[in-house]
Amino acid sequence: MSLHRSEITGALDKNKAPLYRLAKSEDLWERRIAIVATLYFIKHGKYEETLKIAKTLLTDKEDLIHKAVGWMLREIGKRDMTFEEMFLKQHYKEMPRTMLRYAIEKFPEPKRQKYLKGEI
């Protein structure tokens, strides 16, 4: 059986509780599914769930989680840079470096450097 991620997460459009449960799981892959599954919402212009789950995962110890969260933040920024920066300005100093680097990958170089140097 092959289900596309958006088919699965589309079913979560009404009840998002499973995503939050996965985000708090001890299993790395369940936490990663929680954040990557929010791409469905991002593609539909809904960023709130991604940002809530990203906040939950800020202190995660796993590099794969850092990369996934940074990736989803970058996806938000592709659609609404203001929304991404609102989150980053509040949290970039506490974010794991890999997460921050992934999130700001597409920023203009001067702005990227300011984030990396903690000057925002």
Question: What are the residue ranges of the model-derived segments?
Answer:
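Alpha-helical scaffold domains
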Residues: M1-I120
